[in-house]
Each structure stands twice: as C-alpha cells, then as structure tokens.
Amino acid sequence: TIYFYAMDGAIAKGVWDGMLDYDKFFQTNMRNIDTDPVLSKLMGNNSRSNYMIEERHTDQLDYNLAVNVQHNMRHNMRIVGGANLRVNRTNYYSEIKDLLGGDYWYDIDKFAERDMASAEAYQNDLDYYWATGHARIARVGDKYGYYYRAHLLETNAWANYTWGIGGFSLGVSGSVGYSNMYREGMWRKGLFPNDSKGDSKKLDYLTYDAKLALGYKFSGAHSIEANVAYMQQAPKFATAFVSPRTRNTTTPGLKAEKIFAADLTYNLNLPYIKARLSGYYTTIEDQSKVISFYDDTRSSFTNFAMSGIDKRYYGVELGLSVPVWNGLSVVGALSWGDYTYTSNPNFVQTVDNVDKIVLKDKVNWDGYHVESSPQLAFNIGLDYRGPRNWFAGVNFNYYDNIYLSMNPMYRTATAIKYYTNVLTSNTATNAQKASALSSIKTLRKQEKFDSAYTLSANIGKNWYIHRVYMLGFSLEVKNILNDQDIRTGGYEQMRMSKVR
C-alpha cells in the first residue's frame, strides 16, 4: 500500500478498500469474551474468535499394484495384458490455521444454532458434547467443522491385442473391473445423529471397456485411422453423496457412467505440406453432479444432487504445417465442435439443517451447451527451426462459442412457477402474459461469452552435450496485446435474485 500511495493516492485507496479488514477481525476477536455460563467457566477471560482462517485438508493414502505380461506372437501379432489394484483412503477435514487474535474457536454449526432450539442439534461432534457437556474447544492446529474419510477400492484386468500386415493395422483391447466406495464419518453430526458417524452404504459397480482401432497406410504420404470405444465407469466419490461433509446419504438415482466414442482421422505427409484431419463423436450417459451453495430463498446451505445427465460431443479438427523457406513454416489449427446436454436430469434438493428432501424435480437442460470449453478455436502462426538448434515462433489464437456453467435451479419448473401461473391464468392480460414469457426466456437463457483472440511469441535454443545430455532454454510471451477482458469460463450465480 505504501508503494501504491507513492505512485498514486487514489490507487492506494482502491487497493486498501478492496482488502479484508483484518484490523477489525482482530479487534472483534480479542474483545469477544463469551458470557455463556459454560464457556465462562471453561475459558475464563479468554477471547472467543468469530473470525479465523481455516485450512481445508484432503490427505490421501494411496496404494497401487500393477502386474503386466507381454507375449509376441508370429505374423506381427502381440498381446499385452495385466491386472491393477488400487486402494485409497482420503481424510477430509478442516483445520484452524489462525485465530486472528482470539484464543479459541467454539466448534458448533452456526446455521443450525440459528434454526434449532436443541443444543445437541447444532453440534459438529455430538459424541464429544455427550462426553463433556459442551462443544469442542478448538485452537490453532485442531480439526473443526467436519471430519470424514473416503474409502475406495478399484481392481481390473485388461488385455490388448495388436496385429499388422502390409499397410493395415488392427488393435483390440478390453478390460473388466470392480469398484467399491463408501464414506466413513469420524464425527457424529448433531443434525444427523443416525446417519453421519461410521460407514455409509457400500457402493459397488461393475466397470468395463472395449476398444477397436483400425489403421491403413495407403503410402508414406496418405493414411487413415479409425477408433471406436464403449465403456462403463463408476461415478466419482464427490458426486456419490449429497453432502459428504455432514452425512452418509447417497445421491438418489446414482448409476455408472456409460461412454461411447468414435473418431476417424486422415493423415497427409508430403514434402510441401503436412496435415491431419479428424472427426469425432462422443456420448456420455448417466453422469451425476452435486452442487452445494447457500439458498437465499430458504436461508440455508443446500445441496443440489443431479442424476441422469447425458451429453453429446461431435466436431472436426484440422492441423497443418506448410514449409515456406529455410526452416520457416506456416502452421495452423482449426477446431469446431458442438457440445450439448441431451437429457433433462432428475434432481433432489436437501438442506443441511433438515434430514429430508425439500424439493424434487427435473432440470430442463436438453439442448443447452456444455460449459467452459471453446467450441470454436483457430490458430495460425509461423514456426522457425534454425541452425544450431535455435527455434522461434509467433501465433495468433482465436476462441469462440464459450458458455457459462448454468445454475440448474433456473431451469426447473419450480423456478418459473410464478410465470407459468400467469401464462395459464384466465384473468391475466396479454401484456402480463408477454412479460411472463419474456421473464422465462431471460431466466433460462444461457450466457455466451464474447469471442477472444490472443497473440503469443516464443524463442529458444537447445544444447546437446556429448550427444547424451540436452540443455534447453526457452522464453514465451503470451497475450502480447494485453487483452484483460478475456473470459474463459465461470459459474452462473446460485442466488435466486434473477427470478425476482
């Protein structure tokens, strides 16, 4: 701040105003002597922190075992196979890093304290409360809030067969496996005393995949490749539970994911041009997703669990390189795709303060775009490979068709209930119905980001030492045009103010 003030007082003020007011946090914490009889007896004049810095832990213990075998057969045939085993245990917990001037943290669920009359209901560690008569007193380095473990067992056996003759190549591979996962709650949550501590339901899945690869080389300059695959994968632990920090409840409708993928590629390799043209098609079915956020309409922290999410990806990709003069080449790439949702997933909504489903509906996502990835990208540049292992390049990049990650609640019947009532009303005027229809379109419209372009350049050199070692140096400058308004992704707000 001193540096900015020397440069410009207005900038310094802006920087300071944008910072968190840690002075206020320290003063508030140091002056907060809790008058609760239990805390007064336990802690005396020690100050209770209302503000602090936490450190969220994801501590993994991961064991892997792999066995591979290979057999070369006659007539250019080879078979490779093996088996894999993975055992993973991950500890999830939050730890106090800094109490910001206070002496301790009283570990209770403040949202539950607001809504629940019973002291037991807002305990983060109910067993500790039963044993001591008060909530956990946490200091720097102590766990607080939540503590649970994720257990994962994965095993599979696989095989890969390849054969080639002349310009033709064939590859066939497959695997079959088993996946098991469950949650182990280390603390008993006061809101969910019977569904938070101990092991959850064991989730078991059969996994498999089958792949076929074909290739044919017409000549040294022309070749084609084709691949097709179908696989079934177990869902991720993060989407298997509606609120793993608080309880063992699994996501309703949870299924294994099914993936189909196919692609076709043509390769061109001539002295005056090198090119690669590919087309692809992929479908994903039965994905699941859990979004946790503060629901301002319910004044509670909520979990939005979706299942039956289907997606479709298809498109083309082109890459080329054209040498023009003494190591200088024109290079380019083009990628166009259409990534869309193809189903209306089911969802259930739960809140952390109630042990029941508060809302059940469908999300109208069919036809909307999959978020974040550019569905149109273009690159053209110059690439130079000089003597003595010098290299340099300059590239122009263009991106378009990038979409915002959607709030699923906006695409439910519940969110537009007020407007649909207007549309079906016999007393509403045409103007009111037109306004309601416009509001529905505004609510459900998916935001598309503006197109963007960047310019980058690089230069470098490699040194080979005794033909054994390589030492390299490279320098790259990206976004030379200093465009600071590029948006590559983001999330639609989860608050329902857009409805209002």
Where are the language model's segments positioned?
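Surface-exposed extracellular loop regions of Gram-negative outer-membrane beta-barrel proteins
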Residues: 1-2, 10-72, 132-135, 148-197, 202, 205-262, ...
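Outer-membrane beta-barrel transmembrane strands
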Residues: 1-7, 49-94, 140-169, 203-207, ...
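Transmembrane beta-barrel strands of outer-membrane/channel proteins
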Residues: 2-4, 81-87, 172-178, 226-230, ...
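Gram-negative outer-membrane beta-barrel transporters
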Residues: 281-283, 304-410
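Repeated loop/turn-to-beta-strand initiation elements of outer-membrane beta-barrel proteins
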Residues: 76-79, 167-170, 221-224, 272-275, ...
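C-terminal beta-signal and adjacent terminal beta-strands/loops
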Residues: 285, 330, 398-418, 427-435, ...
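Signature of Gram-negative outer-membrane beta-barrel scaffolds
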Residues: 52, 78-219, 346
